[in-house]
Amino acid sequence: MSSQSDAIHPIPAYAHAPVLLLIIGFLMLQPLSTDLYLASLPSLATVFGVPASTVQLTLSMFVAGFGGAQLIIGPLSDRYGRRPVLLVGLALYVIASLLCAAAPGIDLLIVARFLQALGCCSAIIIARAIVRDAYAPADSARVIARASSWLSLAPLLGPILGSYLQVTFGWRAAFVAHSILGACLLAAVYLRLPETNVHKNPRATELAGLIHNFGVVLGAREFWANALPGALSYGSIFAFISGSSLVLIRVLHVPTAWFGYCFAFGVSGYLGGTIVCRRLLPKFGQATTQRIGSAMSLAAGALFLAALGLGAAHWSLVVGAMFLT
């Protein structure tokens, strides 16, 4: 019979550092999957001869696939284990990334992006599950915090790297980079990551249980109080993400090589806000801190609309509004 310590730490202590590196890689997969090809959106519209709204479906379908997969990845890993679900998910990510890179038309690219999201989601969901499996509860929060500090580099460096890939190699290069990153993670999981779910639940995927659990969550007022502000904030961020390159490069004539820096500056406001939030939470509490943040976002958006109403149209206005929002 396994001891309680074994149940909490199925991974040997000497392997914790490689596991932490893997967790960082898993968490970086999602922002890099979106940010790395943003500078290529105007080029995609030109190459395939489609309107900007069609090109933006490559991002919308990724978000839809990523969101939907969260409902099934967790239960599947609870039943079959983290390792097999992760291996299948990363293999799907690599194949889908190669399909994106080789896509002869926009239709296949949109479908491949949806499949890419399914594989990407497995890495994100299982990364957090591995933390719960491999680390004691007192340590898991610190592990996530440490991984998240490295994660902040992805939305800062991803668009910059993607801009140079677009300028140097064209739009397919970003998806080739995705496939290389996915293949490296797949090899690392296969060679280095043992199974961390030592107590598999054969009933985790039963439909009745899933429906009951979803009902409990959806019926909780606390869930909606926290989920709705987060969803609205997330939606506004993706509205900027999906249109930023098209507006900055096509409309405001920002050079493609400079797009990544503009985007990174806007994202730095989000990262700075998280630092400020951590300082405000102990002093004001969650509810008051959320009100302060919401009021600042509303004020920034209103100032942006007022500036547009006065006829101002400059790339710095767009980037500045995103930084403040």
What are these regions (language model features)?
Residues 92-99, 107-115, 316-324:
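Paired small-residue
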Residues 84-98, 179, 289-304:
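Structural signature of the two symmetry-related core transmembrane helices
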Residues 6-12, 194-227:
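Juxtamembrane intracellular "pre-TM" segments in multi-pass secondary transporters
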Residues 290-325:
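C-terminal transmembrane helical hairpin of 12-TM major facilitator-type secondary transporters
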Residues 47-49, 81, 102-108, 119, ...:
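Helix-breaking motifs and short loop linkers at transmembrane-helix boundaries and internal kinks
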Residues 104, 108, 145-191:
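Helix-loop-helix hairpin linking two adjacent transmembrane segments in secondary transporters
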Residues 112-153:
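Cytoplasmic helix-loop-helix junction between adjacent transmembrane helices
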Residues 68-107:
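Conserved MFS/SLC helix-loop-helix module at the cytosolic interface between two early adjacent transmembrane helices
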